[in-house]
Amino acid sequence: MKEKPSGHMLLDILGLISSRLMLVVFGLGTGIITARLLGPHDRGLFTVLLLLPQTLVNLAKMGVAQANVFYIRKRGASVATVASNSLVLCITVSVVLLATCYVGRDWFIAPFTKGAAPAYVLLALTAVPFVLIESYFLSILQAVENFRAYNLQSVYKAVFSFVTIAVALLALHGRLWAALLSQMLVTAGANLWLLYQVRQVAPFGLRWDGTVGRGTLEFGAKSYLQTLAAHLHYRIDIYLIAYFLSPIEVAFYSIAVNMTNPILQISDAIGTVIFPKLAGSSDVDAHARTAITCRHTLFATILAAIFYAGVGSQALTILYGDRYAPAIRPMLLMLPGIIMISLYQILTRNFTSRNRQQVNIVAAVLALGVNLSLNVLLIPRFGIAGAALSTAVSYTLAALLLLFVFVRESGATVRGTVVIRATDLASYPRMLAAAGSRLRGARGTAR
């Protein structure tokens, strides 16, 4: 595929960050409404039940999203073929996963959903096929660099989540069931729209291409362990808090996570845009792009973390109310880990783009083991503060391990990878001017 110039890439990044900022605003609005109207106990259950389909999908999605990008960008696979295979996999995996959940519900679902009615758990599980669609088909938009539709899907989902939650809990005086139902409907609607958008790019159907399918699953098997370990690393603390403590503590911790999530949108947006470019580059170019991206991403993330350290405590109590003040301490303890997550997110894209997922897998599994061990030791003793500390330590370990391997393989230096340069800062006005010029050109064309 033809490479886009740097001004266009910056425009993609700024567009994605802008859409993520909208997600943050509406996400905070949704979080504030649910926190204030559901109360800590039901807010905690709401968090676990919404997270459940995400985790189940990560257990079963087989790394197909990363493989879709790799095969379209690196192997030149037909977008329609990849999309058709993805649809077949969505249906097959959903059926198998839901059947497994039904059979094993007392073993691996009930221990983490204590206090939730079985009907609520069943309602949450209806999101599984739509979460799979989101994973597989967003990756196709990412591969073809259609970031406009990619961004709109997320924005629509956030806006309608806020609106439906407001209607369910304010206008209809609903409780937990109404909040859950509203989110399931939004998830379904947003991802049916996503299918329509991909079909506009490349018409697809319910058919299977064995050659592309086998290659996708072989590549995905490597990414699968990486993404599964990464998801569990990021979310297992919620489940362990639910297991060891109570839904109320889950609510406090989830509020702390929600408050710091806006910082992670920086590295996530940049990583999303840079990944297809890395996948289409030579190793030398990929290493150079990665080092530059790491410097800019860390710089922006550190500035955001410093800002949070100064105003985060006051903002949390103003937004969520004084009864959520116990979330302040874990929020502050998370900040060093958030900085290291940003480095981790960029470096994993480099290794995946070069079909070196084994490096990511080793780092993710090692960090997951450390995180799990520390959580089991610290949560019973220190509560949710122990969970925040565990995450900070384990992500620091994972990021440093990836950095060590990246430096060895690329020939870059640690300083050249993580410390912002004067020339980097000097490039901002030029890149912004180029992005602005392209934006004005796009508007002129639209007219």
Residue ranges and their predicted role:
Residues L50-N58, Y253-F275, A300-A304, M334-I341:
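Transmembrane helix-bundle signature of multi-pass secondary active exporters and lipid flippases
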Residues G27, A60-A77, A143, A256, ...:
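Helix-loop junctions and terminal segments of transmembrane helices
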Residues G7-A65, S94, Y102, F162, ...:
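Signature of the first transmembrane helix
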Residues H41, R105-A124, G310-I339:
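Interfacial segments at transmembrane-helix termini and the short loops linking adjacent helices
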Residues S6, Y71-K74, F130-V155, P336-A363:
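Membrane-interface junctions at transmembrane-helix termini in multi-pass inner-membrane proteins
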